[in-house]
Amino acid sequence: MSAPNPKAFPLADSALTQQILDVVQQSQNLRQLKKGANEATKTLNRGISEFIIMAADTEPIEILLHLPLLCEDKNVPYVFVPSKTALGRACGVSRPVIAASVTTNEASAMKNQIYGIKDKIETLLI
């Protein structure tokens, strides 16, 4: 695998990537996940996104570089994971996924897990 694109910052390490993908998979089961750059953009604009996950091996990466700008405007944490294929698998689809958004739900059973990952992503951004 080639070196990740330097524009893909912050990039999660392997342990954090695994935790993020686990949360993504569980969020998908609870219908708290939006897949794709366009749907991620919609969740940000509506203010229902907890955090955004993007794939660092997206080619060309510029097709999702509008998301970090939007995230910073809306004060939503974001992170890059190394593989779009792994993100696609975690999202429960057979195709690669370049961006995903975990959405808010106050009554969710996963609220604590989501906030835990959100805190870890925020520490990467500092």
UniProtKB/Swiss-Prot annotation:
<dbReference type="InterPro" id="IPR004038">
    <property type="entry name" value="Ribosomal_eL8/eL30/eS12/Gad45"/>
</dbReference>
<dbReference type="GO" id="GO:0000398">
    <property type="term" value="P:mRNA splicing, via spliceosome"/>
</dbReference>
<comment type="function">
    <text>Common component of the spliceosome and rRNA processing machinery. In association with the spliceosomal U4/U6.U5 tri-snRNP particle, required for splicing of pre-mRNA. In association with box C/D snoRNPs, required for processing of pre-ribosomal RNA (rRNA) and site-specific 2'-O-methylation of substrate RNAs. Essential for the accumulation and stability of U4 snRNA, U6 snRNA, and box C/D snoRNAs.</text>
</comment>
<dbReference type="GO" id="GO:0032040">
    <property type="term" value="C:small-subunit processome"/>
</dbReference>
<keyword id="KW-0698">rRNA processing</keyword>
<keyword id="KW-0539">Nucleus</keyword>
<dbReference type="InterPro" id="IPR029064">
    <property type="entry name" value="Ribosomal_eL30-like_sf"/>
</dbReference>
<keyword id="KW-0508">mRNA splicing</keyword>
<comment type="similarity">
    <text>Belongs to the eukaryotic ribosomal protein eL8 family.</text>
</comment>
<dbReference type="InterPro" id="IPR004037">
    <property type="entry name" value="Ribosomal_eL8-like_CS"/>
</dbReference>
<dbReference type="GO" id="GO:0034511">
    <property type="term" value="F:U3 snoRNA binding"/>
</dbReference>
<keyword id="KW-0694">RNA-binding</keyword>
<dbReference type="GO" id="GO:0031428">
    <property type="term" value="C:box C/D methylation guide snoRNP complex"/>
</dbReference>
<keyword id="KW-0687">Ribonucleoprotein</keyword>
<keyword id="KW-0507">mRNA processing</keyword>
<dbReference type="GO" id="GO:0000494">
    <property type="term" value="P:box C/D sno(s)RNA 3'-end processing"/>
</dbReference>
<dbReference type="Pfam" id="PF01248">
    <property type="entry name" value="Ribosomal_L7Ae"/>
</dbReference>
<dbReference type="GO" id="GO:0030621">
    <property type="term" value="F:U4 snRNA binding"/>
</dbReference>
<protein>
    <recommendedName>
        <fullName>13 kDa ribonucleoprotein-associated protein</fullName>
    </recommendedName>
</protein>
<dbReference type="GO" id="GO:0000452">
    <property type="term" value="P:snoRNA guided rRNA 2'-O-methylation"/>
</dbReference>
<keyword id="KW-0747">Spliceosome</keyword>
<dbReference type="GO" id="GO:0005730">
    <property type="term" value="C:nucleolus"/>
</dbReference>
<comment type="subunit">
    <text>Component of the U3 snoRNP particle. Binds to the C'/D and B/C motifs in U3 snoRNA. Component of the 25S U4/U6.U5 tri-snRNP particle, a subcomplex of the spliceosome. Binds to the 5' stem-loop of U4 snRNA.</text>
</comment>
<dbReference type="InterPro" id="IPR002415">
    <property type="entry name" value="H/ACA_rnp_Nhp2-like"/>
</dbReference>
<keyword id="KW-0690">Ribosome biogenesis</keyword>
<dbReference type="GO" id="GO:0000462">
    <property type="term" value="P:maturation of SSU-rRNA from tricistronic rRNA transcript (SSU-rRNA, 5.8S rRNA, LSU-rRNA)"/>
</dbReference>
<dbReference type="InterPro" id="IPR050257">
    <property type="entry name" value="eL8/uL1-like"/>
</dbReference>
<dbReference type="InterPro" id="IPR018492">
    <property type="entry name" value="Ribosomal_eL8/Nhp2"/>
</dbReference>
<dbReference type="GO" id="GO:0005681">
    <property type="term" value="C:spliceosomal complex"/>
</dbReference>
<dbReference type="GO" id="GO:0046540">
    <property type="term" value="C:U4/U6 x U5 tri-snRNP complex"/>
</dbReference>
